[in-house]
Amino acid sequence: SRALNIGMKEVESDAALLLSAHCALYNEVAIEKLIEVQDIFSAAGVFGRQIPTKDSLDIDTRDLLTVFGRERIVYEKHPFFHNAFSLIDTSVWKKIPFSTEVNGIEDRVWAYQVCSDGYKVIYEPSAVAYHEHGLNQGCSNSRAKRVVRALKSLHKNDEVLSFD
């Protein structure tokens, strides 16, 4: 998240495209789709569909195909967001940068914060990128523990969840 904020500080345009080193665009219109949807909804962030590569592990393929569906989703209260292939409104980011207190789900924490401030986050499935390692980067138990700690904190006010 620190590196994301450093990069975002250098952006001089109205929006910043984030594309992970593990991602590759599916086609030449992927970025145009993100921009188009951001303009239509005045969204703080738009993220695209991520699909596995031929070399992705089965566990990553499963996760990508499960999470990144084929229907647009407009999030206003309880968002999901994945910054590996996304477009972020820089004016919103200047008000609400990525938290440096969280590692691994800083994008979801950011989305929750911007939605809490009245902004929208959009999932746009017509914007597509390949993602080699997917959401969880294989089966790293130490990463899973770190992410679960952060998720529990993010969901601490959920009435139906109890982590005691």
Task: Give short role names for the model-derived ranges.
Residues P52, R70-I88, N103:
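A recurrent flexible, glycine/aromatic-enriched loop bordering the glycosyltransferase active site
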Residues D14-A24:
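Short beta-strand-to-loop acidic/aromatic patch adjacent to the donor-nucleotide binding site
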Residues V46-R49, E124-P125, E132:
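Short glycine/serine/threonine-enriched helix-capping/active-site loop
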Residues V121, Y130-D164:
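Active-site-adjacent helix/loop segment of glycosyltransferases
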Residues A24, E28-I59:
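Conserved donor NDP-sugar-binding/catalytic core segment of glycosyltransferases
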Residues S1-V11:
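Glycine-rich, basic loop-to-helix element that forms the pyrophosphate-binding segment
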Residues E12-S13, H82-K95:
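Conserved nucleotide-sugar donor-binding
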Residues N103-Y112:
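Acidic donor-binding loop at a coil-to-helix junction in glycosyltransferase catalytic cores
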